Structures are given as C-alpha cells and as structure tokens.
Amino acid sequence: MLELLYATGMRVSEMLHLQIFDVNLQFGYVVCNENGKERIIPIGIPCKKAMERYLQTARTVFVKDEKETALFTNCSGKAMSRQGFWKVLKGYADDAGIKRDIAPHTLRHSFAVHMLQNGADIRSVQEMLGHSDISTTQVYPVSYTHLRAHETSA
C-alpha cells in the first residue's frame, strides 16, 4: 500500500477504493476513479513487483470470498477502511522507530516533489495527482524550491 501511494501520488481514499480490475500489472498502470473522473497512473517496476507480491501472498491469505474485488482488504477479507489503513501506517512508523506523527498525505507530497526534482513537467504531475486546477499543483515547486534553499544554506 505504501509503495503504491508513493509511486502514484494517490490519495488514501482513491487507493482504498481500488478494485482488483483497476490494476494492470502487465502494462504497468492503475486506473483511478474518483469523483466521476477517471485517470490512468503509470507505475514503475518496484511498485509492480510489490503489487505482484501482495496479490500472490497477503491478499490470498485474507480474502476467502472470491467475489470480493477490493484490492486492499483487512484481516477479515473485507475492503480496508481509512481507520484500518491509519493503523497499518502507524504500525509501520512504530516499527521504523518514527516518533513523529506521520500522515498519508506526506507520501503524496513526496511523490509530487520527487517527480519535479527528477524533471517531470508540472502539467504531467497535475494530471497524475488529479488536480483540476494547476494552482493546486504549483504548491509543490514552492516546497521543492524551499527545500533546495534550505539545503544550500546548511
């Protein structure tokens, strides 16, 4: 889940609404349907491999009802809730020794900043994030510029 969030910049709600048929590992993309809008988000090899492992191992352990199409499920094999995801995230943070509060949106923010750092154009990032207004996406270059200024002054 964390790999998918970071690799795509999806919102947690978008990820939790994914169905198995929304993921195409052969061609490396995820179809995100949120608020009546559909967007196709590419995923790279690390994310594809993580998704393959999840689908072949963890999901098959939890899901007993073959009619269940939710991509991410809880231990009972039902679609995972936001609260359930929050517990998973908190557990990973604790395991990693992270003491500060961690928010799922941090992964979305990191995705956008890292895409821009590595040469993606802002319009492409806007489309992948699903922002209808470019001004929402323009916050990320400001964050990136602020980070670079902080790095060079240190």
Residue spans for each PLM region:
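Extended, charge-enriched helical/coil interaction regions that scaffold DNA-processing
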Residues: 9-11
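C-terminal catalytic core of tyrosine-transesterase DNA break-rejoin enzymes
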Residues: 3, 7, 91, 108-132, ...
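Short functional hotspots where side chains directly engage DNA or cofactors
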Residues: 28-33, 103, 114, 126-144
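Major-groove DNA-contacting interfaces characterized by cationic-aromatic clusters
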Residues: 48-87
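Conserved small/polar residues in nucleotide/adenosyl-binding loops
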Residues: 145-152
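N-terminal core-binding DNA-recognition domain of tyrosine site-specific recombinases/integrases
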Residues: 40, 79-83, 101-103
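Conserved tyrosine-mediated DNA breakage-rejoining catalytic core shared by Y-recombinases
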Residues: 13, 17-53, 67
